[in-house]
C-alpha cells in the first residue's frame, strides 16, 4: 500500500495459511488497494504464529497459553502504536478479543481487544477514510452463511454490509444455525452423525436448492468445508469477492481487460 496509508497488521491464521493461502493473499491485496500500509505479523523464530485456538478447543490450556504469548510478543510493537490487527478467521481473531483476557493476565493483553478486528468490521469502521472502489463481478446473487463466532459478536451484519457495496450483487443471508462442523467437532468419527444432522437442519438443504450461478459465501474455514462435504458446492470467503471486484475496478480505471 501507499507509504502514507493507514497502517494495519495482518494476522494469517493457521487454517488459512496452509489450506487456503489465496485468502490471505486476497486480504493483503484488498487492504493495500483500499489505501492501507500492510504489515504481516511474524515471529522471530520464523515458526508461523498461531492464536492457540485449536489447543484451547482440545482443553490443552498450557499449550494455548504458550501460543498466545508468542503471538502477543510479535504483536506488541503494533499494539503499542495502536495499529489495528486485521484477520479473516472468526474463531481465531475473536479468540484474541474474548478468551485471551481469561487465558492471560490483563497486563499482558492490555490494548489488544480494542485493536483487533475481523476484515468486515475494519472495513465498515473505516469506510469513510479508506479508498474502496468496486465494480460488478461475474456474480449477481450471493448466498451468505456466517460463522457462529460472527453471529455471536454480531459481525455477520458487517459482512452483509460489505458485500452490498459490490454493484449489481444481491446478498441473501441463509437462515441457518451452526453448520455442524464447529471447528474440528465434525472431523471426529464419533460426532459425524450429529454434525451432519446439524447441517441438514437448514444450511445444507438451502445450499442444494440454490441456482448454480449463485456464489456461496461462508464465514469460516470449517463452515466452507462442511458445505463442500455436505453438498458438493464450493463456498468462498467474502474477501475473494472483494478482491475480484477491486481487481475489476483497477482494470477499468487503467483501461485493462484483466489482471494477473
For each predicted feature, which ranges?
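Iron-sulfur cluster-binding electron-transfer modules in prokaryotic oxidoreductases
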Residues: 1-260
